[in-house]
A protein has these predicted regions:
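Conserved N-terminal beta1-alpha1 strand-loop-helix module at the mouth
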Residues: 1-224
Length: 224
C-alpha cells in the first residue's frame, strides 16, 4: 500500500531537474536563494516555475534574510512558498507570512526553536540536522520527538534513498525533504535516486494521512 507522504525535492538549479522531480511524483520543488553551490537567481527560478503544473508547491529557501527581500524574491520568482532556514524570529516569520501564501520554518533538531516550533505559527515546520540546508548530514531521529506538536512536520537532513524508509517509519513525519541525497553532483539530480527516494518514502508511509490534512493537498488554491 502506498501511503500519503509529502515529498519535496530541494536545491533545484535547472529546468530538467524540476521536470524530473515532477514526473517522478514530487509534491514540491525548492530553490535556494541563500549562499550555496545550489544558489539560483530569481529570474532563473521564474523561468523554471512557469513551466511547472499548478498543483506543484514551489518553494524559495532563505537564511536570515530581510522579510521584504524574501517577499520580493518570492514574487519575482513566481513561487508559492517561503522556507526560512535561519534564526528568524517569530516576528520576522509573521512579516513574511502576511504576504506569502505558504511559509515553512526550518528548525535545527535538538534546538530551543525545535522544542518551541509551534510559536512560529507556520503552515509547515521542517526539522534539519545541525549545519543542514543541503549539507547532507543525518541527525539523531529520536530528537524529532522533542519538537513541539505542529500540524505538518517535514523531515530533512541527510536523507537518501537508502535511509528514507527507516526515517519515515521511525519519525512518522507529514513529509520529507531531500537535496544532496538525490544528486550526482552539486546542483544536478540523479534520476534513479529521485525515483527511488520518492517511491520508498511513500511505501514507508502509513496508509492514512498524518495530521489534519487529506492528501494530496491543493497547492493551486490561491484563495486566502
Amino acid at each position: 500500500v502506498i501511503g500519503a507522504m509529502f515529498v519535496k525535492i530541494c536545491g533545484i538549479t535547472n529546468e530538467d531537474d524540476a521536470l524530473l522531480a515532477v514526473a517522478m511524483g514530487a509534491d514540491a520543488v525548492g530553490f535556494v536563494f541563500a549562499p550555496s553551490p545550489r544558489q539560483i537567481a530569481a529570474q532563473q527560478a521564474y523561468d523554471i516555475t512557469r513551466r511547472l503544473p499548478p498543483e506543484i508547491l514551489t518553494v524559495g529557501l532563505f537564511r536570515d534574510e530581510h522579510p521584504e527581500l524574501v517577499v520580493d524574491t518570492i514574487h519575482r520568482a513566481g513561487l508559492k512558498a517561503a522556507q526560512l532556514h535561519g534564526h528568524e524570529s517569530p516576528a520576522m516569520v509573521e512579516e513574511v507570512a502576511k504576504q506569502v501564501r505558504w511559509v515553512i520554518k526550518a528548525v535545527v533538531a535538538g534546538s530551543p526553536d525545535a522544542r518551541h516550533a509551534d510559536r512560529f505559527g507556520t503552515d509547515m515546520v521542517l526539522v534539519d540536522a545541525p549545519g543542514g540546508g543541503g549539507a547532507g548530514k543525518v541527525f539523531d531521529w529520536t530528537l524529532a520527538a522533542e519538537i513541539a506538536d505542529v500540524p505538518r512536520l517535514i523531515l530533512a537532513g541527510g536523507l537518501t534513498p537508502d535511509n528514507v524508509t527507516d526515517a519515515v517509519q521511525r519519525v512518522r513525519p507529514w513529509g520529507v525533504d531531500v537535496s544532496s541525497g538525490v544528486e550526482k553532483s552539486p546542483g544536478r539530480k540523479d534520476p534513479l535516486k529521485v525515483r527511488h527516494f520518492i517511491q520508498r518514502a511513500r511505501e514507508a508511509a502509513p496508509p492514512l494521512h498524518v495530521g489534519p490534512d487529506e492528501m494530496p493537498y491543493d497547492w493551486a488554491d490561491d484563495d486566502w
